[in-house]
Amino acid sequence: MEIRNEIKAYIVREGMTMNEVVDRLAEEYGWSSSVPNLSGKLRRGSLRYSEAAELADVLGYDLVWQKRK
C-alpha cells in the first residue's frame, strides 16, 4: 500500500475528515490550514518525518521503529 493511501486509511479509521485533521494540525503545530497542501504532500510523497510524527500524534498514534525479525 502506498504511504498516501495508508495515511488516508488511518484518517478514515479515526472517523475524521481531512479538514478536521488539517484544523488540528494548524491548531496544535502551526501547520497551514489548507487541505490541498496536505493532499499535495501526500500525493508527491514529500511529507517530512517531523510532519508524519505530528500527523500521527493528532490521529492518536505513535511512530514506532521496530527491528525486523
Regions found by a protein language model. Give the residues of each.
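A short, Lys/Arg-rich alpha-helix, primarily the initiator
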Residues: 1-20, 24
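Short hydrophobic/aromatic patches at helix-to-coil boundaries
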Residues: 2, 65-69
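Catalytic phosphate/metal-binding cores of nucleic-acid and nucleotide-processing enzymes, i.e., regions
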Residues: 8, 12, 26-32, 66
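Recognition helix of helix-turn-helix/homeodomain-like DNA-binding domains
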Residues: 28-47
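DNA major-groove recognition helix of helix-turn-helix/homeodomain DNA-binding modules
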Residues: 50-64
